[in-house]
Swiss-Prot record:
It catalyses: a 3-oxo acid + succinyl-CoA = a 3-oxoacyl-CoA + succinate. The keyword Transferase applies. The gene is lpsI. One of its GO terms (molecular function) is succinyl-CoA:3-oxo-acid CoA-transferase activity. Heterodimer of a subunit A and a subunit B. Belongs to the 3-oxoacid CoA-transferase subunit A family. This is Succinyl-CoA:3-ketoacid coenzyme A transferase subunit A. Pathway: Bacterial outer membrane biogenesis; lipopolysaccharide biosynthesis. Keywords: Lipopolysaccharide biosynthesis, Transferase. Its EC number is 2.8.3.5. The keyword Transferase applies.
Length: 242
């Protein structure tokens, strides 16, 4: 895999296509940030859709929706396997999975988050009570501690992490915007190479160190997307008085 320059001025790329070039390849495992459609790297996903890369394993909280987010990569059949938690908003995902065309490794949401965190921290595996006695535990080691039963879950790591942040400085220090932080930091730390899509890039020193959510040591490439669509996944409005 090509090495990525880590100098403060070398992390910014002209566009999402350039940011993906040389690091994303067929058959890789990608960790993609977001929670539903909140905090997803829209431009990077679209650029990935427009590339010829295929056979991907994607670790993500969700599978996007039809025609947006990771749903675009499912429509183009670029994803071979999903390691995910909530996938109920995507009809194409459902169709491919039920037809045996798509592999799925299903995880409780907290377990998925901890598997990513463990991967970033260099912890190979951990025990959790979540899923014991269910199909989640099938084929996995179980143990009893102090009278309680636990399932052994292994860490997750990715070849490349694609994440979304609100603001970055030129060294890659990131600030996330409220709930859009979600799975993004965990994905970044679990990726051997991390590409961050951000809405604003400022000079080094412009961000108060106490406000940095993810240090630049975890970020290899930056791409600016100042006006993401930020599509709403489920819109609920109050019924008018009758």
């Amino acid at each position: 895999m090509n090495q990525v320059a880590r100098g403060a001025g070398a992390k910014r790329y002209a566009d999402a296509k350039a940011a993906l070039a040389g690091v994303v390849a067929d058959g890789q495992t990608l960790a993609v940030g977001g929670f539903g459609l909140c905090g997803i790297p829209e431009a990077l996903i679209t650029a990935l859709r427009d590339s010829a890369v295929s056979g991907l394993t994607v670790i993500s909280n969700n599978a996007g929706v039809d025609g947006f987010g990771l749903g675009q990569l499912l429509a183009t059949r670029q994803i071979r396997k999903m390691i995910s938690s909530y996938v109920g908003e995507n009809k194409e995902f459902e169709r491919q999975y039920l037809a045996g065309e798509l592999e799925l490794e299903f995880n409780p949401q907290g377990t998925l988050a901890e598997r990513l965190r463990a991967g970033g921290a260099g912890i190979p595996a951990f025990y959790t009570a979540t899923g014991y006695g269910t199909i989640v535990a099938d084929g996995k080691e179980t143990r009893e501690f102090d009278g309680k039963h636990y399932v052994l879950e292994t860490a997750l790591q990715a070849d490349v992490a694609l994440i979304k942040a609100w603001r970055a400085d030129t060294a890659g220090n990131l600030v996330f915007r409220k709930t859009a932080r979600n799975f993004n930091p965990a994905c970044a730390m679990a990726g051997r190479i991390c590409i961050a899509e951000v809405e604003e890039i400022v000079e080094l020193g412009a961000i108060d160190p106490d406000q940095v959510h993810l240090p630049g040591i975890y970020v290899d490439r930056l791409v600016l997307n100042a006006t993401p669509e930020k599509r709403i996944e489920q819109r609920t409005v109050r019924q008018g008085d009758k």
